[in-house]
């Protein structure tokens, strides 16, 4: 696969995850509704930092794995592809709305409380790391150059920040 195609496919698959409600989406929206837009932005930036960490770990850890042991990488590609198919199937099949946890921080907490909430929500979500490994095992190869990996990482981080800031606007009244 051409490096730019790999970058576009990697970022596109990540962006598709935005439309599947999960813990990261709910923590940003809930915080925005309960504590305001600024708190939601800080929570979203915490989630985006978690995405940056896991995607970087996946992108560059996967590169090491690819070069060291092709058999393990082939197994990860198969398992990753099956996981992505299972994830898509369950997303289509189950349209239930998860329960949102109750907000435990006071409404007027310092910025770092909200940032930490977003970061810990993302880092404690095992689905995040599994999804990144699955995406990278399908879209990257041993030949994918470092610049393409860096572009994919930057695209993931940028799209994560933009999406989380968009979600933090939940406290505003919708305009039809």
What are these regions (language model features)?
Residues 19-20, 123-124, 162:
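Transmembrane helix irregularities
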